[in-house]
UniProtKB/Swiss-Prot annotation:
Gene Ontology cellular component list: cytosol
Name the record gives this protein: Nucleotide-binding protein Ping_2261
Alphabetical UniProt keywords: Nucleotide-binding
InterPro entries given in the database record: DUF520, UPF0234-like_C, UPF0234_N, YajQ-like_sf
Single Gene Ontology MF annotation: nucleotide binding
Family: Belongs to the YajQ family.
Annotated function: Nucleotide-binding protein.
Classification via NCBIfam families: PRK05412.1 (NF003819)
PANTHER family on file: UPF0234 PROTEIN YAJQ (PTHR30476:SF0)
Pfam family, one: DUF520
Organism in which the protein naturally occurs: Psychromonas ingrahamii (strain DSM 17664 / CCUG 51855 / 37)
Keyword Hydrolase included in the entry's annotation: no
Amino acid sequence: MPSFDIVSEIDTSELQNAVDNANRELATRFDFRGVKASLSITNDVAKLSAEHDSQLRQLMDLLRTNLIKRGVDSRAMDPETPNHTGKTWTQVIKFKEGVDQPTSKKLIKLIKDNKMKVQVAVQGEQLRVTGKKRDDLQAVMTLIKGTELDQAFQFNNFRD
């Protein structure tokens, strides 16, 4: 029986490249001259810091555009609330990987509500979808791509 997996993964090298490109662009921007602003990443957690909250928002937009340029979906970003300590504003952004329990339940409910002729099984942080026909699996793929969930999904391990 044909099957495929629904996963949510981030290419960490592309994530690092996007942060490096954002840092390069930050160094050349006129509105950030003479301003203490930084952008760093460690273990899939980005840390933004700037002197004003408006500059922090600009850093966030800068990171988001560079992520999109590098092919990393910006829906994987999970920003925390900005923190103001002394003279600097900091914001920590975590990147979501894996399909968590509530999201997998939403996906299963979505597939069941559309009466697709497939079976869905949760396997850790991914979902395995099996069906009798390849067309049913492709219909599930287009259904998931068309929904607005807070996470980016990839389809891999397609077996016939």
